[in-house]
């Protein structure tokens, strides 16, 4: 569910809350499914964050999809994949480059043994860059940071745990005390070989 307050002339014009109508929400509530593309891990709920990019209001989730487009009144319009260029997980906390307007993303999924760095163009029409940075396990990557020349990939010891998944835990990630945390510095135009940990 998303909540919003529209401010106008120093006053609250309205308060609204709406369900983001992903496939899972449509099924649970008996609503029609939202139009738009689907991919293998777009079964999520788009319930973690709301961001603005390229004039769009987007509801996003960690470790999967979908990316849902919303109206200014918070109604769900459609799921999007940036015109077929997003083929897997997105992120709940991407960052907009204040100079280029591009959206920088650190994505992860429980089946991946890498962190996926994505760039969505300033127009919001395409993923223009994808770099898979191997880490050898399935990390939980909550955030990303950018500088003028680099992206900072945060790899802390919160890892997917198959045993917890098999036990039915909805969030099958665990903190591994004896593993160090790392910050990877990737040049904005670099490859996975250029990451410095």
Annotate the PLM regions.
Residues 17-128:
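Well-ordered mid-protein domain cores that form the structural environment of catalytic cofactors
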Residues 107-110, 119-121, 131-135, 145-148, ...:
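Short, structured patches in soluble enzyme cores that scaffold and shape functional sites
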Residues 92-95, 139-143:
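Conserved beta-propeller blade repeats
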Residues 141-143, 147-157, 164, 174-176, ...:
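Extended catalytic-interface subdomain
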Residues 87, 110, 137, 176-179:
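Active-site-proximal structural scaffolding
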Residues 1-22:
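N-terminal low-complexity or amphipathic/hydrophobic leaders
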Residues 1-5, 114-126, 165-192:
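Beta-propeller blade signature
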Residues 10-16, 73-79, 123-128, 144, ...:
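Beta-strand initiation motifs
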